[in-house]
């Protein structure tokens, strides 16, 4: 079998010039006046930063009326159906404050104090409600119930379960 050598002929190709011209495509032209003013939204009043001082540490929907016992049990039941561990927390102050340090850290008042231990193995919303009533009798400050996912190790749900009279 004889070896054959093929000679390739080199052809001159034009260098790459980019994509096709878009001159034939319709283009929406913006007026130059719309780009003349660049704004970060400084004139918008509905997007202001929440004041950091003098605010209660209530959660997202805390402006709503207090939950009834039935609504509270439904929330806890939802928490349990998702296999989250219920925990009770309370806050004596209700305000963000710094007592021992001027730098932000764990003990600067942004975190609530946990009531007893998380309720691992809890399967009934009435157990959580009974524990909430015991917590209210012992410390009549603000109470929150949270749902903790011990697999992902994250908090998935928090809501205000009890606000003492006179708190806003």
UniProtKB/Swiss-Prot annotation:
**CC terms in the record's Gene Ontology section:** chloroplast
- Which residues, by range, are in coiled-coil regions? none
Which processes are annotated in GO (biological process)? photorespiration; reductive pentose-phosphate cycle
State how it assembles: Heterohexadecamer of 8 large and 8 small subunits.
Keywords in alphabetical order? Calvin cycle, Carbon dioxide fixation, Chloroplast, Photorespiration, Photosynthesis, Plastid, Transit peptide
Q: What else is known?
A: The basic functional RuBisCO is composed of a large chain homodimer in a 'head-to-tail' conformation. In form I RuBisCO this homodimer is arranged in a barrel-like tetramer with the small subunits forming a tetrameric 'cap' on each end of the 'barrel'.
- What is the recorded function of this protein according to its Swiss-Prot or TrEMBL entry? RuBisCO catalyzes two reactions: the carboxylation of D-ribulose 1,5-bisphosphate, the primary event in carbon dioxide fixation, as well as the oxidative fragmentation of the pentose substrate. Both reactions occur simultaneously and in competition at the same active site. Although the small subunit is not catalytic it is essential for maximal activity.
Name of a matching Pfam family: RuBisCO_small
Tell me where in or outside the cell this protein is found: Plastid, Chloroplast
Q: What is this protein called?
A: Ribulose bisphosphate carboxylase small subunit, chloroplastic
From which lineage does this chain's organism come? Eukaryota, Viridiplantae, Streptophyta, Embryophyta, Tracheophyta
- Transit peptide: which range? 1-45
Asked if the keyword Plastid belongs to this entry, the reply reads yes
Name of the gene encoding the protein in the UniProt record: RBCS
State the similarity comment: Belongs to the RuBisCO small chain family.
Q: Which cysteines are joined by disulfide bonds?
A: none
Q: Where is the signal peptide?
A: none
């Amino acid at each position: 079998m004889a070896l054959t050598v093929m000679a390739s002929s080199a052809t001159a190709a034009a260098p790459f010039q980019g994509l096709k011209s878009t001159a034939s495509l319709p283009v929406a032209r913006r007026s130059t006046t719309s780009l003349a003013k660049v704004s970060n939204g400084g004139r918008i009043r509905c997007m202001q930063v929440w004041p950091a001082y003098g605010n209660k540490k209530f959660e997202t929907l805390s402006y709503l009326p207090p939950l009834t016992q039935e609504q509270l049990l439904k929330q806890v039941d939802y928490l349990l159906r998702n296999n989250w561990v219920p925990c009770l927390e309370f806050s004596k102050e209700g305000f963000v404050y710094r007592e021992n340090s001027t730098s932000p850290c764990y003990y600067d008042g942004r975190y609530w104090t946990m009531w007893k231990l998380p309720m691992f193995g809890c399967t009934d919303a009435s157990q959580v409600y009974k524990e909430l009533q015991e917590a209210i009798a012992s410390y009549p400050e603000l109470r929150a119930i949270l749902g903790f996912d011990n697999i992902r190790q994250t908090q998935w749900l928090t809501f205000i379960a009890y606000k003492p009279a006179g708190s806003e």
